[in-house]
């Protein structure tokens, strides 16, 4: 297997994308946080002591998406053109599903940015609710869709 992040001497390197075409690239990722009923109720009633949980998670998800290259060593700094978020209430768990879609026109994909945005957003929910519930579970952080670039499209079935 040829790993693109290793050079001929097996040393880590950032992939050279300078010869790639600029194309529109979109990636959507999602993840779930399961919380206890008291934590869920605090979010819905907007009574969590640290403030508005879901609004803060959205801002954190956008920031996480933008900061991916500072967190993941081999990710290129990207000029994102759009970051969209959605948080779905899951009262049956109880919990929340966070979805992040990142978009750009450039030479490399935005999958890691969407995944990082989801991760940071869910971690923010955890941070803001940990005084109420330490047993929260973050799960199923995954790529849902990707389009653009040489590797083709991906859609989770």
UniProtKB/Swiss-Prot annotation:
Domain of life of the organism encoding this protein: Bacteria
Pfam family, one: MoaC
Subunit structure: Homohexamer; trimer of dimers.
Gene3D superfamilies assigned: Molybdopterin cofactor biosynthesis C (MoaC) domain
Chain's role: Catalyzes the conversion of (8S)-3',8-cyclo-7,8-dihydroguanosine 5'-triphosphate to cyclic pyranopterin monophosphate (cPMP).
One of the record's GO molecular function terms: cyclic pyranopterin monophosphate synthase activity
Lineage: Bacteria, Pseudomonadati, Campylobacterota, Epsilonproteobacteria, Campylobacterales
Enzyme Commission numbers on file: 4.6.1.17
Family label: Belongs to the MoaC family.
CDD domains: MoaC_PE
Official protein name in the record: Cyclic pyranopterin monophosphate synthase
Residues the record marks as active site: 127
Catalyzed reactions per annotation: (8S)-3',8-cyclo-7,8-dihydroguanosine 5'-triphosphate = cyclic pyranopterin phosphate + diphosphate
Example GO BP: Mo-molybdopterin cofactor biosynthetic process
Keywords: Lyase, Molybdenum cofactor biosynthesis
Pathway assigned to this chain's UniProt record: Cofactor biosynthesis; molybdopterin biosynthesis
Binding-site positions, substrate: 74-76, 112-113
